[in-house]
């Protein structure tokens, strides 16, 4: 007899989320945690909220607030120790929702320790001297920072987004190796706190996976705030000379106080003995089908193990699909079309669907691209954020294929376009939806109306027909 319906191998936020979802199916669920998950995303995002608060405080000076106080906006800053404490509290509150105690109350068997798959003779998981037998297994181990092989890096010492809480003071000079989303966010964050920040990437620009124009605009904002961006540059060596850290980046030698590595993430498979039970994988991701099954049909995977950006909401979606297949019938397929994500710089970058480059590759000249700036939007004028950018990519039949938004609230704005893509809606539907005036969301309507206008110009027969109809009405009135 089997012990469980599903055993979840966790050690990540995704693993705990998956256990909470699985408990709603009223089966027998076990969560194995080889290690306690690090809630670095909650901590990192809480720090960014502090930077957002600092920005808002500076904006209030222009409205006459803080009368009688120091009026030099440039002197406003964060107290690093207080910011760290607040971020830790915020991360703890976020993680408390799926604490081990709460999961146990939901009926989940929580098991601490490392395990490995065995065939005795059937598939099972051995952990702490126990053999756990289950109908299915879900791999949700999360990921760890990818550390590039750089001479002297380990001896020099470095930080990652997971060890940022160990930073005792704001570094005067900070070098960031790699340009993943968290690295870009933190480059701007520390620049706003007064650090001299240099970010070093091998690509031609930051955020190479994103739409080029949107990525260049984010890079321009960082550079305007004092961040030095070294593109197409490889870090050759790091070392400590007379107590000072040095980086050899291309033909430049940089003296820095701290080094932050933000070169992406890689799955941590632990020593699960996966190859013995027929699971194929490489150092970067598992081999999964559309149902999120591995090459062993009784073992599923989700989250960072699937590759792509390490966003929690995408991992949670994958866990939902995998658990539907496990607890119901294996007929549900993962569909990434219409799943949005955002990079929380200032302004933010929100993205969904295809980039301009991808759309041209898939559809050729059958696409239309509509771009607008936020220059003439009243809300953007009030916020002083007129450098925003909105791009909508459509098939010529009106079906929405993708969007990129750069604005202070892009992470909120992108949702309506994501829903439209998810439901297969056309841009005419967006054009028919009134937007609240004096909000950034008015941009949805502006772009949709611009698309309609451009196509009405192309359909000259329609314009001629309407003009003739109006002439006929005037004649007979």
How would you label these PLM feature ranges?
Residues 2-4, 20-148, 154-170, 206-207, ...:
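Glycine-rich flavin
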Residues 110, 139, 160, 229-231, ...:
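A structural signal for the hydrophobic beta-strands that form the central parallel beta-sheet
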Residues 156-168, 258-328:
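FAD-site-proximal beta/loop scaffold in flavoenzymes
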Residues 141-196, 275-277, 281-291, 295:
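Glycine-rich dinucleotide-binding loop and its adjacent helix/turn
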Residues 2-4, 9-52, 346-347, 352, ...:
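Flexible, glycine-rich terminal cap/loop adjacent to redox cofactors
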Residues 171-175, 181-241, 250, 312, ...:
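Rossmann-like dinucleotide-binding cores of NAD(P)H-dependent redox enzymes
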Residues 7-9, 115, 123, 131-142, ...:
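Short hydrophobic core segments
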Residues 10-13, 177-180, 210, 304:
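Glycine-rich Rossmann-fold phosphate-binding loop(s) that bind the pyrophosphate
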């Amino acid at each position: 007899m089997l012990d469980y319906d599903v055993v979840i191998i966790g050690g990540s936020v995704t693993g705990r989320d998956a256990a909470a979802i699985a408990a709603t199916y009223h089966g027998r669920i076990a969560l194995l945690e080889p290690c306690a998950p690090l809630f670095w995303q909650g901590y990192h995002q809480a720090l960014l909220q502090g930077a957002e608060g600092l920005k808002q405080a500076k904006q209030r000076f222009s409205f006459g607030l803080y009368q009688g106080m120091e009026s030099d906006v440039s002197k406003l800053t964060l107290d690093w120790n207080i910011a760290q404490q607040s971020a830790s509290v915020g991360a703890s509150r976020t993680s408390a929702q799926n604490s081990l105690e709460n999961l146990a109350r939901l009926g989940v068997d929580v098991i601490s320790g490392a395990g490995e798959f065995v065939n005795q003779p059937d598939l099972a998981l051995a952990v702490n001297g126990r053999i756990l037998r289950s109908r299915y297994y879900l791999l949700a181990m999360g990921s760890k920072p990818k550390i590039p092989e750089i001479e002297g890096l380990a001896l020099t010492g470095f930080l990652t987004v997971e060890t940022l809480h160990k930073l005792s003071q704001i570094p005067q000079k900070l070098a960031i190796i790699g340009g993943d989303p968290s690295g870009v966010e933190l480059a701007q964050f520390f620049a706003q706190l007064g650090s001299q920040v240099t970010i070093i990437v091998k690509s031609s620009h930051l955020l190479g996976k994103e739409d080029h124009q949107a990525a260049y605009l984010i890079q321009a904002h960082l550079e305007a705030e004092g961040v030095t961006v070294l593109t197409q540059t490889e870090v050759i060596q790091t070392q400590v000379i007379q107590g000072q850290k040095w980086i050899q980046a291309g033909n430049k030698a940089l003296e820095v106080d701290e080094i932050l590595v933000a070169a992406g993430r890689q799955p941590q498979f632990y020593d699960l003995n996966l190859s013995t039970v027929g699971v194929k994988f490489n150092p970067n991701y598992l081999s999964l089908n559309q149902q999120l099954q591995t090459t062993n049909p009784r073992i599923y995977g989700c989250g960072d193990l699937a590759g792509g950006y390490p966003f929690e909401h995408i991992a949670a979606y994958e866990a939902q699909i995998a658990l539907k297949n496990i607890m119901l019938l294996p007929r549900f397929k993962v569909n990434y079309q219409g799943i949005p994500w955002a990079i929380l710089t200032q302004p933010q970058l929100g993205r969904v669907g295809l980039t301009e480059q991808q759309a041209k590759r898939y559809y050729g000249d059958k696409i239309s691209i509509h771009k607008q700036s936020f220059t003439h939007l009243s809300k953007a004028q009030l916020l002083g954020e007129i450098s925003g950018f909105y791009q909508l990519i459509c098939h010529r039949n009106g079906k929405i294929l993708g969007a990129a938004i750069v604005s202070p609230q892009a992470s909120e704005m992108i949702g309506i376009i994501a829903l439209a893509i998810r439901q297969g809606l056309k841009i005419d539907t967006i054009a028919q939806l009134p937007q609240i005036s004096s909000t950034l969301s008015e941009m949805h309507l502006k772009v949709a109306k611009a698309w309609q206008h451009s196509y009405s110009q192309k359909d000259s027969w329609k314009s001629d027909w309407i003009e003739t109809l109006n002439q006929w009405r005037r004649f007979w009135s």
